[in-house]
């Protein structure tokens, strides 16, 4: 049924001053006051009892709305007229409806068991400052939530698996203890014996360690520390760990099951052959007219020809360290008191000019093998010096 809402009348516009006129114009088919028992239209007070206002005969035909419902219906009808006319609705008409909806929602939806509030799609937190970590049932964490977070420090990273151990603990567990390094050092020693590069030579770890096996323990501490800082190799740690603190020459335990006497005889034989083929290697150092200050130039190794460190055999590149501690101590004392010989670029290039040195080669006890190893990196002249001394001693 259409209602006569043709236009806004002054009475409707001024509904706050005259609510009776607005009600009459909006709802002409409804009475503003309830009917009396006799039907004469006499209104009774609001404080009158229900039986006095509505007799049993008229109680069967009660009006469809109460007084409060009439007021709300009038307000909604007025808002509807504003919407139809295209006029903005005054805020004082909207606020009562909003308050009514808030009270209605608080009455039906704000139950403590449900926890839902009006105009909210998710559950409200009854304790905002508490950690929201739960087990899905009744338990909840009692700690305070961290700033800018819904959880405490413990439950902030709940997605990670906390049963795993920290990374630092795993690294310590995976690292080998010092005792296992000694047991597994035999394999690197055997692998180093087959290499042709001087970087895998066992002389360097022996020099780097002050108490290491081989010739390193017979050298002065200052010389050993100086060479140890220069000749440090990546694979020198297992050798130093094996040889440190012991007096045994461990280099000969990784080359096979031959006895030490057989290996000494083989080294001396090859050293004698090398000294015969290359007599220019055996210059006496005490007759050298060049002091230490004359070493202003360090020539390249191209003058060596075929006698380069890479062309030397494996046996020639091994240092000679089985003559004893007394013999090496004498050599170390001689080394400090002697001057260095000229380098390769200052020597004669041909073998004819070496004929005058034949007599000097016979007197081989006047120079030490340790000094010769300074100019020849592979220390092949150590074997020549040692074999010559043993020959003169016989």
Curated annotation (Swiss-Prot):
Ranges of residues in domain WRC: 125-169
Tissue specificity remark: Expressed in stems. Expressed in panicles.
Activity regulation (UniProt): Transactivation activity is repressed by GSK2.
Compositionally biased residues, Low complexity: 170-180
InterPro entries per the UniProt record, alphabetical: Gln-Leu-Gln_QLQ, GRF, WRC_dom
Molecular-function GO terms, alphabetical: ATP binding
First-listed, main subcellular location of the protein, grouped into a coarse class: nucleus
Pfam families: QLQ, WRC
Keyword Glycoprotein: no
Sequence motif Bipartite nuclear localization signal, location on chain: 130-140, 158-165
Highest taxon listed in the record's lineage: Eukaryota
Induction / repression: The microRNA396c negatively regulates GRF4 at the transcriptional level.
Keywords, sorted A to Z: Activator, Nucleus, Transcription, Transcription regulation
Note: Plants over-expressing GRF4 exhibit increased grain length, width and weight. Plants silencing GRF4 exhibit dwarfism, delayed growth and inflorescence formation.
Subunit structure: Interacts with GIF1. Interacts with GSK2.
Family membership: Belongs to the GRF family.
Domain observations: The QLQ domain and WRC domain may be involved in protein-protein interaction and DNA-binding, respectively. The C-terminal region downstream of the QLQ and WRC domains is necessary for transactivation activity.
The name this protein goes by in its record: Growth-regulating factor 4
């Amino acid at each position: 049924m259409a209602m006569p809402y043709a236009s806004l009348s002054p009475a409707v516009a001024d509904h706050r001053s005259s609510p009776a006129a607005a009600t009459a114009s909006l709802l002409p088919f409804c009475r503003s006051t309830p009917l009396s028992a006799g039907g004469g239209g006499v209104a009774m007070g609001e404080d009158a009892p229900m039986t006095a206002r509505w007799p049993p005969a008229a109680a069967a035909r009660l009006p469809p709305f109460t007084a409060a419902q009439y007021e709300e219906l009038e307000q909604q009808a007025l808002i509807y007229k504003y919407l139809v006319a295209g006029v903005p609705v005054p805020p004082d008409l909207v606020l009562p409806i909003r308050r009514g909806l808030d009270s209605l929602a608080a009455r039906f939806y704000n139950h403590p068991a449900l926890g839902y509030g009006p105009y909210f799609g998710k559950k409200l937190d009854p304790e905002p400052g508490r950690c929201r970590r739960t087990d899905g049932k009744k338990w909840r964490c009692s700690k305070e939530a961290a700033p800018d977070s819904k959880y405490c420090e413990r439950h902030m990273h709940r997605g990670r698996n906390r049963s795993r151990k920290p990374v630092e603990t795993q690294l310590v567990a995976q690292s080998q203890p010092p005792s296992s390094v000694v047991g597994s050092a035999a394999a690197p020693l055997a692998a180093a014996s087959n290499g042709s590069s001087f970087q895998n030579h066992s002389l360097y770890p022996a020099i780097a360690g002050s108490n290491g096996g081989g010739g390193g323990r017979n050298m002065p501490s200052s010389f050993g520390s100086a060479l140890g800082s220069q000749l440090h190799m990546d694979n020198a740690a297992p050798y130093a760990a094996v040889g440190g603190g012991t007096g045994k020459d461990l280099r000969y335990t990784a080359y096979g099951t031959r006895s030490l006497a057989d290996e000494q005889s083989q080294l001396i034989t090859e050293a004698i052959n090398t000294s015969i083929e290359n007599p220019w290697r055996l210059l006496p150092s005490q007759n050298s007219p060049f002091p230490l200050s004359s070493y202003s130039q360090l020539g390249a190794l191209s003058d060596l020809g075929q006698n380069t460190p890479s062309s030397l055999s494996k046996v020639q590149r091994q240092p000679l360290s089985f003559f004893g501690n007394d013999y090496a101590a004498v050599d170390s004392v001689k080394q400090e008191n002697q001057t260095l010989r000229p380098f390769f670029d200052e020597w004669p290039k041909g073998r004819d000019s070496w004929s005058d040195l034949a007599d000097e080669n016979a007197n081989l006890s006047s120079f030490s093998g340790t000094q010769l190893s300074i100019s020849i990196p592979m220390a092949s002249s150590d074997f020549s010096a040692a074999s010559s001394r043993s020959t003169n001693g016989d």
